[in-house]
């Protein structure tokens, strides 16, 4: 039986890390991409607003994720990748194709964090908007362009975009900084959200499956850092591993095919199907 191979971007921590581990448990070798390769060489995070400087490094690295993948008896392939830097994206994909001949599953999970995520239209510098579009749209499209030909040659593959309600709800419930996201983040997510539809209409008849997955509110390392000073009640947040369980099910289950043309709530899917028994929403 041919070995199953997956690529997960943004896999040094949070949702991407748990997706990588869940896919390894499901029998996939997993290429993992992010900026932070080693815990000994941490990459500082950017502040989500121009009004606060915060460059603390978050826990997590590709090195640690790779160890978890390999603990499941699967191969890992750590790749340094910065989604705001297209050459680094292309270099990482060239490595995957050279080493593994491509992948059967792509999880476009990586995202850009920076000023504009929680800033108003007027406060956000125009170059910050460009970074969101580069990371969430241009780089995501380029990754699809680079993995899709081999999938088509093999007669099938699965592509998942980790989306957000910020990407498909055109009228936000709250302004940025008061429970809502800034236009920079919303632009990036909405642009990335449209990729799946184009994949399906152009290549669905050729065996390519594609899904948009909204993780909902998840208590990642990044969110924990942002919330620690606010006193916000995060008790209803899902653990990242719940999203990992949802994605692993979508990738391998034929029953998931009917969900391809919808906005999939990872949390609702997990609860409905009992995919992560350790979590029950309060």
At which residue positions do the language-model features occur?
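Short-chain dehydrogenase/reductase
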Residues: 2-100, 114-120, 124, 128, ...
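Active-site loop of short-chain dehydrogenase/reductase
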Residues: 4, 74-75, 102-103, 151-165, ...
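A short helix-coil junction within the Rossmann-fold of NAD(P)-dependent oxidoreductases
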Residues: 26, 99-100, 113-116, 146-158, ...
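Conserved Rossmann-fold SDR core element
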Residues: 102, 193-199, 203-218, 257-264
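Catalytic loop of short-chain dehydrogenase/reductase
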Residues: 112-114, 123-127, 158-205, 217
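A short, exposed helix-loop element centered on a Lys and neighboring polar residues
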Residues: 144-145, 197
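C-terminal helical subdomain
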Residues: 190, 212, 229-282
């Amino acid at each position: 039986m041919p070995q199953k191979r997956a690529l997960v971007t943004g896999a040094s921590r949070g949702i991407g890390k748990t997706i990588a581990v869940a896919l390894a448990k499901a029998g996939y070798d997993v290429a993992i991409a992010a900026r932070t390769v080693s815990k000994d060489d941490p990459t500082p995070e950017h502040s989500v607003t121009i009004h606060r400087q915060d460059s603390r490094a978050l826990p997590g690295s590709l090195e640690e994720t790779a160890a978890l993948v390999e603990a499941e008896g699967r191969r890992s392939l750590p790749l340094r990748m910065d989604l705001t830097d297209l050459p680094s994206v292309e270099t990482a994909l060239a490595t995957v194709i050279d080493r593994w001949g491509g992948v059967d599953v792509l999880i476009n999970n990586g995202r850009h964090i920076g000023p504009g995520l929680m800033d108003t239209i007027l406060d956000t510098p125009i170059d910050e908007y460009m970074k969101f579009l580069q990371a969430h749209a241009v780089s995501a499209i380029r990754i699809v362009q680079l993995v899709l030909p081999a999938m088509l040659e093999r007669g099938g593959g699965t592509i998942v975009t980790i989306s957000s309600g910020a990407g498909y709800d055109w009228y936000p419930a709250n302004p940025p900084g008061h429970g809502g996201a800034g236009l920079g983040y919303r632009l990036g997510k909405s642009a990335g959200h449209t990729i799946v539809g184009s994949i399906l209409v152009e290549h669905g008849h050729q065996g390519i499956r594609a899904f948009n997955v909204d993780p909902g509110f998840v208590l990642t390392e990044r969110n924990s850092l942002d919330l620690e000073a606010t006193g916000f009640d995060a008790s209803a947040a899902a653990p990242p591993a719940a999203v990992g369980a949802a994605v692993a099910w979508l990738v391998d289950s034929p029953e998931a095919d009917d969900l391809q043309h919808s906005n999939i709530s990872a949390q609702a899917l997990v609860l409905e199907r009992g995919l992560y028994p350790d979590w029950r929403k309060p």
